[in-house]
C-alpha cells in the first residue's frame, strides 16, 4: 500500500505519444501513477495504429494527446491526465517540468532529445530516454543537476553535441 501511494502521488511527463510514448503511458496508468502529462503536437494517422497501441482506426485525424488522455482515464479512472497539444521549445520546457518527478522522452528528433536532456539537467529532473531505429531500441536513465546523486550523469556527458541532421535518417526513411 505504501508503494502504491507513492506511485499515485507521482507526476510523470511523457514527451511523444507515438510508438514509444503509447506503451509507456499505458504502463504508467496501469500501475497507478497518479498524474501523467503527455506532450505531442501530432494527429493519429492510419500508418500509426499498428505500433501506437492507444489508438485505433476511429481515431484517425484526432489529436494524439486527446485520444491518449481518454484511453488512460478509461484504463485507470481517478488518475489525472494533462493533454498538452504543443511542441516543447526552449521557451516552455522548464515551466513544463515544474512539479514533475520523472521526465520520459519518447520523441523522435535529436533536437527534442537534447532540449529535454538540457532541461532535465537544469531542473534536476530524472530523465528516462528512449529511442528506436528499425529493430534496435535504446533506453537510458540520465540524472544530473540539482538533487541528483553525486555520480549522476547527464546525456551530454556521453553525447556532448547533437549529430549532424544529415547523418541520421528520419523515422520515415529508417522504417520506424
For each feature predicted by the language model, list its residue ranges.
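Adenine nucleotide-associated cytosolic modules
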Residues: 1-176
Amino acid at each position: 500500500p505504501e508503494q502504491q501511494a507513492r506511485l499515485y502521488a507521482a507526476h510523470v511527463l511523457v514527451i511523444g505519444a507515438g510508438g514509444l510514448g503509447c506503451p509507456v503511458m499505458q504502463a504508467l496508468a496501469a500501475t497507478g501513477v497518479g498524474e501523467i502529462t503527455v506532450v505531442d503536437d501530432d494527429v493519429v494517422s492510419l500508418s500509426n495504429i499498428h505500433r501506437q497501441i492507444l489508438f485505433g482506426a476511429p481515431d484517425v485525424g484526432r489529436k494524439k494527446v486527446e485520444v491518449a488522455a481518454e484511453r488512460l482515464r478509461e484504463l485507470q479512472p481517478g488518475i489525472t491526465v494533462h493533454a498538452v497539444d504543443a511542441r516543447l521549445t526552449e521557451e516552455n520546457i522548464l515551466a513544463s517540468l515544474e512539479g514533475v518527478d520523472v521526465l520520459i522522452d519518447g520523441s523522435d528528433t535529436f533536437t527534442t532529445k537534447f532540449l529535454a536532456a538540457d532541461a532535465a539537467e537544469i531542473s534536476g529532473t530524472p530523465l528516462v530516454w528512449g529511442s528506436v531505429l528499425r529493430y534496435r531500441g535504446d533506453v537510458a536513465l540520465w540524472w544530473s543537476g540539482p538533487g541528483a546523486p553525486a555520480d549522476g550523469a547527464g546525456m551530454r556527458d556521453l553525447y556532448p553535441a547533437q549529430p549532424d541532421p544529415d547523418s541520421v535518417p528520419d523515422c520515415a526513411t529508417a522504417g520506424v
